């Protein structure tokens, strides 16, 4: 399949990839028609989705199954009056219905807004009114339905609330199993009419409210070409093939889900493995990977921090050939420990809700622990300091040059917010707001957000380097480094630390904070060592699992 969308589909080296990578973008590209329906026609019996849950239930769907289900859902939604450009919010956890549903919405031309089940009624009101959401489709969990019902009176744009079950409250519509599996998709003329119209190209397709590490969520909107841009994510970073069974750990409300559980994987022709769990337990994930013989795996760094504390040798993970991570920087100590046990290097990557994978340790490269890898050639990536290109090992901001061309995968705008769009996208560059340094081999290393850099006694200190040093101590499970006001230094370094299991008693031992400070001094320059250490039970995080340093800073203010 990928040969239809690339001028050259195979590359012998990273240099070959950098020099010859180029997309072939069909006019009015629509992932639903140009990829999914095409697979259904060419290889109808090929496995597309393998879903299982905590109860041991299992579902296996082929590409022909997904086409049939999506057409049935098209028929169901069109009958309700849902049409092109309607905003449809989907709160579906990891339920299998998410996959045919998003394909159906792409066929209709509606804008999909995936959302996490962790939203409160206040969050739902904000989203519905900011985006004029017309329909909410949710899994029938009582807590989710309750929050939606509490929000509903304050959301005048919402016309339909649809539950996929098991709970269907009064005033809601039900999208039943029979609607999905045995609906009218094969005979409904609306389905064939939409196929003839074939929405796509630069029409709006999907929008995310960014979880954000500060401020109210932004509305990041992408067109239909965004799906195609994830081909590189799957084929050359996740390294999936048509024979792969790929697992990405992500709720469907996060942007990570379409990075690793949908677009690129299905363009390549891999099967997507979904473990629909209610409570995250590292041992359960490992058992599922062993049972189903998962071949490639991607998870945020937090998951790896938990995995390396398990007895990984108890599990037969010999099927696992390739592992990746993104979402935030991974501490080298975690990467090294995973390699020592599994003999697999974790291939890191970097991107944002606004982009696809912009930097990655691609499959031809040697992984360097702590490095995000090199620029994806579909983006013109630069590292800038005060308007000039950064030198090797100099910290600069990661920017995407857009003066000559706008790369496939870059967002269209912050929806309904041109001022904010212009703040980050001006003078021919999109500014990510993320800082990094580049070594002499061209590998990038994450430093932090522009706002996270600590300025202490004339030094500029990146929080991630201090966090890396702390994470090499066996007592530290997680940590966040921030600045606090200091009369002499301007700012001082503070570390907020979560202790690992078995070390919790140390939080009440006064000398232990001093031990951690001395440990950091042994690992890096002494001026970077935290002057203040606070022990907590957990760190504040965004709904996608990123540490909210801004919340820690606000407590100090």
Which functions belong to the PLM regions below?
Residues 44-47, 163, 168-169, 183-209, ...:
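Conserved pre-ATP/AMP-binding loop-to-beta segment of ANL
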Residues 45, 49-103, 120-125, 176, ...:
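Conserved AMP-binding/adenylate-forming core of the ANL superfamily
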Residues 59-64, 198, 205-229:
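Conserved AMP-binding A3 loop
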Residues 103, 107-178, 501:
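Structural core segment of the AMP-binding/adenylate-forming
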Residues 119, 125-126, 136-141, 297, ...:
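AMP-binding/adenylate-forming catalytic core of the ANL superfamily
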Residues 228-248, 252-295, 310:
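Conserved AMP-binding/adenylation subdomain of ANL enzymes
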Residues 267, 294-298, 308-368, 380, ...:
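Gly/Ser/Thr-rich phosphate-binding loop
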Residues 388-423, 461:
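Conserved ATP/PPi-binding loop(s) of AMP-dependent carboxylate-activating enzymes
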